[in-house]
Amino acid sequence: MIIKNIKSIPSPNLNYIHISFCPNNEYTNLAYVSISSILSSKSLNTFICFYLIIPSDFDKKNKNFLDSLYEEYEYFNITFITMDKRYNNSYTDHRITEQAYYRFSLGELLPNVNKCIYLDTDIIVYKDLYNFFNLNFNGRMILGYPSYGNQNRQKYGFHRINTGILLLNLFEMRRNHFEKQVMKIIKKGRKFQYHDQTLLNDYFKKYLGIFPPEYHARPWSNYTEMKIFNNIIGKPFDSDYFYFSHKYPTIRHFLGNYKPRNFNINYIEDWWFYARKSKYYNSKSTTFQSAFSF
């Protein structure tokens, strides 16, 4: 581990949280804003260990840009891990790159870490993640939030999870040789409709559990989806609880077409609040332009 400043040195008196992102060059600015929101929202006694799994062509200037977070925040460190070519033959398209599959290798890439939060780069965090990090897996290996797409509703019901925010039991992933299982599936050459998300839900359903809605709020919500979530977990519907979880979540995910380039979606100003906090932010510069092309 490279020590960037004295307050990036771990201490036994702090609560540790392990978080991974898998950005490429195009998504660096989104990752910067996501990490900034995490560091702005964490408690003083929380130390964040970030693991950025990057492709071999990740630009040095993008590493330096992310390292500039040390100038603004404290009690965290960032470890860059360059991925090899193991996912070169995974199914991709113009929108989804092979980095989408990197999360499946976190158990092997982080051999000394037993659990980890995985986050897509299109999220912001409002609160300390300690409670999320310490959720009970209840015998499951991967926790996520139900995927509510219309096609999922019609074909699968609601027992599928979105892979943009995951809590991973890396110890169990290693014990179950999860990465090897994934690689065998990828080698078969199947074209997954929703890429990593289809792969995980189609082949590993027995490993999957769900976490509360406060850890995966979206820019929109509706009564039907909330009620079906309660049907899944077998508890009475509580509209006040869901309203609070959506209005005041721990994590918000700008998934699908609801991205920072779209100023007409709910809560997008929250994202730009963290973007503007950076001393590198300039609305007329190219520093944050890639956020619009995502």
Show where each model-derived region lies:
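A glycosyltransferase accessory/donor-loop signature
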Residues: M1-I17, F21-P23, V33, L170-F294
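Histidine-anchored nucleotide/phosphate-binding helix
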Residues: T28-S43
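Short loop->beta transition adjacent to catalytic acidic/histidine clusters or analogous donor-positioning motifs
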Residues: K42-Y51, I78
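Short internal beta-strands
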Residues: I48-S56, G144
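Active-site-proximal specificity loops/subdomain of glycosyltransferases
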Residues: N62, Y70-E108
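Short aromatic/hydrophobic "clamp" motif used to bind/position activated sugar donors
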Residues: C116
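Catalytic metal- and UDP-sugar-binding loop of GT-A-like glycosyltransferases, i.e.
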Residues: L119
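Conserved donor-nucleotide/metal-binding helix-loop-beta segment in metal-dependent transferases, i.e.
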Residues: I123-Y156
